[in-house]
Amino acid sequence: MTPLLELKDIRRSYPAGDEQVEVLKGISLDIYAGEMVAIVGASGSGKSTLMNILGCLDKATSGTYRVAGQDVATLDADALAQLRREHFGFIFQRYHLLSHLTAEQNVEVPAVYAGLERKQRLLRAQELLQRLGLEDRTEYYPAQLSGGQQQRVSIARALMNGGQVILADEPTGALDSHSGEEVMAILHQLRDRGHTVIIVTHDPQVAAQAERVIEIRDGEIVRNPPAVEKVNATGGTEPVVNTASGWRQFVSGFNEALTMAWRALAANKMRTLLTMLGIIIGIASVVSIVVVGDAAKQMVLADIRSIGTNTIDVYPGKDFGDDDPQYQQALKYDDLIAIQKQPWVASATPAVSQNLRLRYNNVDVAASANGVSGDYFNVYGMTFSEGNTFNQEQLNGRAQVVVLDSNTRRQLFPHKADVVGEVILVGNMPARVIGVAEEKQSMFGSSKVLRVWLPYSTMSGRVMGQSWLNSITVRVKEGFDSAEAEQQLTRLLSLRHGKKDFFTWNMDGVLKTVEKTTRTLQLFLTLVAVISLVVGGIGVMNIMLVSVTERTREIGIRMAVGARASDVLQQFLIEAVLVCLVGGALGITLSLLIAFTLQLFLPGWEIGFSPLALLLAFLCSTVTGILFGWLPARNAARLDPVDALARE
């Protein structure tokens, strides 16, 4: 008969300083299906090392070990995990149940890694617990169970995937005599059902219940009686549970890892919250700076647009401050007409200005009088609280009419409800008030100078007696490039004048400069916020490293029941990502509260959250979890099952 487990000249040595200590010395052993074998020996004899090699938790230094004819030396880590999952069931002296899982959930764990669907897992776990007399303890946690009950849960877990070979390491060592007898009775029942049962013990009474007792001393087998053929043995076991397809196994494993991650977070609420705090602050900082910074930028740009955007101002001279008399009369009315005919011009308004005295009854104030066209107010985004602007007839007839700003109206007519139609003196010229213009409130503040506007024809002909213009403001049509329009305007006037005796000021260039400046500032602040997010990520990595250390035994248990390294990696990586995602969601909520609070104190600001900003925030959370969770998850996946199980 072919042995189920076959060991030939197995040796296992461990480094001890500069030397190698040999624990197993040429072990040769055959174990047949359906046997109940006891391996006995004193502490340090090598029996636990032999059990680890039998259960594929450890590899021999040399020699050959075959399971059902398969040489385990040819298998990689994932194949060994599959072998443990499908052929072996472990029963440990200290039970090794996961404390945060119920009895039922502990029994389900091996089937999770086999890819069995949840409904089937649940039914099989309940069936096994019922068979072992624990049907009324399925929802109990390990701390709520007695030692004997915990060991029965451990046995049920060993049988979850079939348990063709049951490896029991001191199964009664931590139990009282009555519970120990119950456990041994269960092992006998399993033997009768066709399971191969291997008991590692130093208790002679337990060993005596086995059909064959193998004694090991100082790493060598000193007693190995031949296997006894059983007349009624069937040589089989209950069928192994059917594993699901690769896709279902992946989905089941992912869902279980997600569930386990959530349970781990819930089990340490305060630590989880403190871990999330760095992510919450980081995400809230990034989102708030992006959103509030964008609102501030739009506010600044709106103020600049209120001054007049997409406009080009033309002034006489070489540059600001140039008062050379030869350039003062450079701009003429003919230039204005020529500019208005250009296809890229939406409107062109001249400006003639002079500081004059305004008088009404006994009120006498200084003001800046500006001669403009009717388009001037549209160009600069001004509205009228009373009356209206000049019409073409008033421009052509040099009408003695005037538009006041709100400050001038308040100074001249503090108690009048309606000032349209009133007559004031502008310099020495009487003028009828036809409107009151309201300038947009700007975060840059308002000028202290009182301002009035007259038709440019009136200002130049009746007030100043000059035939030239102080400036021309050109509004470029939508769709035309402002910089190109500025170049064409410069060429036009240079050809007309025969020289360049003027200069231009493009407000669109100012707008672009401000946009660039605000973007740079916003980027700088975002980078500062990202630093806080990185600090939060480092905090997550630190806590996850601590978590891996604390849960080393749990990792060993999972590997013993069939978890692959990739399963462990996935679980801890998902846990890190989940911490960051929940922290990210709370961070976004905090940034919303910050934004709404700011809006209460800054009603003029339009603070809005774009879906892209929220998506980027969640993306940042996910990337942070992956980046800073990778190292702890990798460390967990690289743990040796034997070392992990030995940790306290």
Swiss-Prot record:
Entry-linked SMART domains: AAA (SM00382)
UniProt KW Transport keyword: yes
One term under GO cellular component: plasma membrane
Membrane-spanning residues: 273-293, 523-543, 576-596, 611-631
Gene Ontology molecular function: ATP binding; ATP hydrolysis activity; transmembrane transporter activity
Localization terms from the record: Cell inner membrane
Domain of life assignment: Bacteria
InterPro entries: AAA+_ATPase, ABC3_permease_C, ABC_transporter-like_ATP-bd, ABC_transporter-like_CS, MacB-like_ATP-bd, MacB_PCD, Macrolide_Exporter_MacB, P-loop_NTPase
Membrane topology: Multi-pass membrane protein
GO biological process: response to antibiotic
Record key words, sorted: Antibiotic resistance, ATP-binding, Cell inner membrane, Cell membrane, Membrane, Nucleotide-binding, Translocase, Transmembrane, Transmembrane helix, Transport
Residues where ATP binds: 41-48
Domain ABC transporter: residue ranges: 5-243
EC number(s) per entry: 7.6.2.-
Keyword presence, Cell membrane: yes
Assembly notes: Homodimer. Part of the tripartite efflux system MacAB-TolC, which is composed of an inner membrane transporter, MacB, a periplasmic membrane fusion protein, MacA, and an outer membrane component, TolC. The complex forms a large protein conduit and can translocate molecules across both the inner and outer membranes. Interacts with MacA.
Function (record text): Part of the tripartite efflux system MacAB-TolC. MacB is a non-canonical ABC transporter that contains transmembrane domains (TMD), which form a pore in the inner membrane, and an ATP-binding domain (NBD), which is responsible for energy generation. Confers resistance against macrolides.
Family the entry assigns: Belongs to the ABC transporter superfamily. Macrolide exporter (TC 3.A.1.122) family.
PANTHER family: MACROLIDE EXPORT ATP-BINDING_PERMEASE PROTEIN MACB (PTHR30572:SF7), MEMBRANE COMPONENT OF TRANSPORTER-RELATED (PTHR30572)
Protein name in UniProt: Macrolide export ATP-binding/permease protein MacB 1
Gene coding for it: macB1
